[in-house]
Amino acid sequence: MTASESFVGMQVLAQDKEVKATFIALDRKLPANLKVPYMKNAKYRTCICPSSNHLVDDCVCEDVIIAYTAHRNNAVAALLYSDGNVIHRSGTLKPKSQNRFDLRGFLTSVNPGESSRNEAGASKSTQKTYDRKDKSPSKSRNSKKGAKKSSSARKKKEYSSNSETDLSSDSDANTRKSKRK
């Protein structure tokens, strides 16, 4: 069966409250109808995710794919269809090089790759701190004992300073009362 024989017709997707809410959140105009071509043979079913034209099996979204057999997120499908007209391939997004990505972030953010870069930078910095801790285990044990002594000394200083401020605040309150009388 060829692709032309497999083509049945345009399938209109139903719009529910979730789809309308998604379009409102994205500040997009809700199209009158979402039309998607339906193919009998799965071999010719192309994915309608926001990346460029490819087969369902080759989708970079992996488990978030929207195949023609199960439209779980009509809003994503509608990104390719504006008022029933297909956006040209040059207007669609290029496939992602990552295995998986957050589709919600993909829809709302300007540059979806930023969050993954930030996470990678954070993991590198935490790895550096772990490496520093591993280099001097004997120093850390000695410093803990010193830290206990210094913390108790700090507490004593804080307690004495707090009691002095309490006394001064009490005396200030007494002077205010006497001035009122």
Curated annotation (Swiss-Prot):
Subcellular location, principal: host cell
Low complexity: bias regions: 160-172
Domain of life: Viruses
Disulfide bond entries: none
Keyword set, alphabetical order: Host cytoplasm, RNA-binding
Pfam families found in the cross-reference section: Pns11_12
Family: Belongs to the phytoreovirus RNA-binding protein family.
Protein name per its UniProtKB record: RNA-binding protein
